[in-house]
Design a protein with these regions (language model features):
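Residues within HEAT/ARM-like alpha-solenoid scaffolds
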Residues: 46-50, 71-72, 87-94, 129, ...
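Helix-turn-helix repeat elements of alpha-solenoid scaffolds
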Residues: 10-17, 52-56
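Ankyrin repeat domain, specifically the short helix-to-loop turn at the C-terminus of the second helix
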Residues: 19-27, 54-64, 94-105, 134-144
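Ankyrin-repeat-protein effector appendages
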Residues: 1-6, 128-145
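Acidic (E/D-rich), amphipathic helical modules within compact regulatory domains
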Residues: 40, 44-50, 57
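Ankyrin-repeat boundary/"N-cap" motif
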Residues: 1-6, 29-44, 68-85, 109-124
Length: 145
């Protein structure tokens, strides 16, 4: 994959690719994708360790974890569960923990009336037993059912 801008880097690159393009604004918005940098950082699980570094950095820089995509009104947690269909369970839990610790609204309803937990249950294609720790973590932190 050829990395040509910050949006390519945050979505498909490494932490170093991302840093090569980062200009100091953690809340840049890609009007074509309809997502913020933080949201784009969780649309796939390519280079999971790098994604975690990028996500941590964006959070530390003040990225808005509750920014809603204009089209579907989804926050980063909705987008992660809806986009990454077969994540490694530990990666899924780590992304969930980072976003919740940063203050993401786990009960925010999107345009379709769904909260992130609903996408974790219906969109993620892993056995329930495998990702039960994620469900439990969300519920322990106050997620509605």
């Amino acid at each position: 994959m050829r990395i040509t801008d910050i949006f390519d880097a945050v979505r498909d690159g490494t932490y170093f690719d991302f840093m090569d393009f980062y200009s100091g604004n953690p809340n840049l918005f890609n009007k074509y994708a309809g997502m913020s940098l933080l949201q784009l950082s969780v649309v796939n699980d390519r280079y999971p360790d790098e994604k975690i570094k990028i996500l941590r950095f964006l959070i530390s820089e003040g990225a808005d974890v509750n920014f809603l995509s204009p089209k579907d009104q989804r926050n980063a947690l909705h987008i992660f569960y809806f986009s990454v269909l077969r994540p490694e369970p530990q990666y899924m839990l780590k992304i969930t923990q980072l976003l919740i610790a940063a203050g993401v609204d786990i009960n925010k309803k999107d345009k379709y009336g769904a909260i992130p937990l609903q996408y974790a249950i219906t969109a993620v294609k892993l056995p329930t037993k495998t990702i039960m720790p994620v469900y439990q973590y969300l519920m322990d932190r106050g997620s509605n059912m």
